[in-house]
């Protein structure tokens, strides 16, 4: 007889990882709101397209999130240059290159060819946040000899925090 009980330890790890990932997203949003107020950049979260398939009794909506090629964040920097960023978070000590969704590599490659800045914002459960150039992420195997990264691999891309704790993704925001 198969044991269908879920491992409570693994469940707790999953809950904690999800909460940390949501905090990472809130930190990113707060930084971009700050840059918008300063007139440094206008970078917005790309809405996830939701496809409604129907309603259950009681009005509950049934549907699914459609796969998308657009990155999580898109916007413009002061001076007119476009910027695109895909945000990824892991509760593990490494992040796989395959975490970028199908279709996104081609999308980001095209934007980069046209002169946009493109990055992957990588968050790790130990609190580290990194802004990795898309060209480095895309050629991870050539840079690191494997298709995943660890925090030790990407220290040069670490995003500092300001004295108030804000992620200084584009710099301190005092420019």
Predicted regions and their residues:
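Active-site-proximal, substrate-binding regions of enzyme catalytic domains
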Residues: 58, 66-70, 80
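Short, electropositive alpha-helical surface patch
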Residues: 133-154
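Charged phosphate-binding loop/patch that engages nucleotide di/tri-phosphates or the phosphate backbone
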Residues: 2-15, 152-175
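Acidic-basic catalytic patches of nuclease active cores, encompassing PD-(D/E)XK
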Residues: 2-64
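Conserved catalytic cores of phosphodiester-cleaving nucleases, focusing on short active-site segments
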Residues: 71-75, 79-92
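Mg2+/Mn2+-dependent nuclease catalytic core
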Residues: 90-107, 114
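Short, basic, glycine/proline-bearing loop/turn elements
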Residues: 55-60, 86-94
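Nucleic-acid nuclease catalytic cores
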Residues: 109-139
